[in-house]
Amino acid sequence: AAKTKSVPICGLKTVAEEGAGFAGFAISGMGMEPHGPDFMARGDLSTLTPVPWQPGYGRVVCVGHVDGKPHPFDSRYVLQQQVQRLQDKGWTLNTGLEPEFNLMRRDEQGKLQLVDPSDNLDKPCYDYKGLSRSRVFLERLTEALQAVDFEVYQIDHEDANGQFEINYTYSDALTSADRFTFFRMAAGEIANDLGMICSFMPKPDPKRAGNGMHFHLSISSAENKNLFHDASDPSGMGLSKLAYHFAAGLLAHGPALCAFAAPTVNSYKRLVVGNSLSGATWAPAFIAFGANNRSAMVRVPYGRLEFRLPDAGCNPYLVSAAIIAAGLDGIDRELEIDHVCNENLYSLSLEQIAERGIKTLPQ
């Protein structure tokens, strides 16, 4: 969850130059003790935006400093370090994130229920009625995102009841992570104002598709050329050798990437082998690579990669950093893709999966 302090406008300069002080021991995962120095959240003023659902407020993203230096446990700083590795090569990782979420409420007994009890189809994906009945929340969230320069281009009902996805254009990895953090804040607050709960829980219903957050990936040059694209690719996937090596790095580190992309116990209910009531989980259970194959961990929309492992409960900074580290390892070692899987992995038995040399993700 995002941590914050409210600062009057007169204190903004101090936050940018010195930082707002936190007791680091009170923030989980910072590796600090109660007798240690303060954790100083130093604001990056380039990220300053209004908070559309709270008139008169603004938001600025910070990086933690301890003793005047960036704190190595700060996840945004972790990503900045990996981004620098790319910049040293003249590259930028572009990521397009696809957050999925459920709209719920509590009944009189305190039990979680769908906001829309009529959203009960076995195959609700792209359902018009379900989308229309939730339009007030979706419109308010979209307007809030657009007010801070998100280019929202489509909204749809997903494959679980009460599940939706909002798509917005890609950006560099650091900006994308900042934006998704803002997205979760906006969705939660706007839902609360409407008496709803917006849940990014990876698998709220064991019988339904879970909430993923697929990462679309490409590397661009200093001239903004997509270095993952090669029209001469004989496979027809439009990928360069660089892209294949990067993808092979993701596959090689698939189990380890779960620690970042699937960070909770509930995450592994989403990655389970098997199907949902609709016939597909839309989540990968196998370490596989395929052309437009949504049952694989790495899918190839023409000329780029889609990493389907992450769920919507992840830390986007850590996932992005891990993606860069794994991909660069694949590039540095010139790893190759052993097998292109163009089959529906949901329909194969575990024996058939093993025969193809495909490994299973941690379960």
Label the model's feature ranges:
Residues 94-105, 114-128, 148-168, 198-218, ...:
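Core alpha/beta catalytic barrel or barrel-like domain that forms the active/cofactor pocket
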Residues 170-182, 205-206:
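Active-site neighborhood of thiol-dependent amide/isopeptide-bond enzymes
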